[in-house]
Amino acid sequence: MDDLDYKILSLISNDARISFLEVSRICNVSGAAVHQRVQKMMANEIITGSEFWLNLKKIGYQTCAFLFLHFSETTNLDRIVEKLKDIREIVECHSITGEYDIFVKIYALNNSHLYEIIQNQIKPLGVVRTETLMSYKESFHRQFVFG
């Protein structure tokens, strides 16, 4: 990674819709050079995708919660994580230190829906203890931005 790569990252992380042509003009290099560098960063998994973020409240998902999960059998956490991936309402999953094993961010239609997901999909995976924190307001949401 050199200064040009970091400048390209800064531009595209600030605006995923910016064209390679615009990036090339700002960086004073050819569009092909920008394309090659972005492709190389994708191949090296520095860039892992581009996406649109949904406003889930606008499509009915009124509850956002953070769950701390402790499992009876921690030797199978990789298998558990694979099963958590199948729960579409879970949007983040982290293996953590401390008294819990896994931390997830989850969206649900409402509190009853959240309860159903926890009881019917998460607890059967071997959860012995949970702690749930409810978000009452998202103050900001962003991608890490260079520059």
Give the positions of each predicted feature.
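A compositional/biophysical signature of low hydrophobicity enriched in polar/charged and small residues
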Residues: 1-147
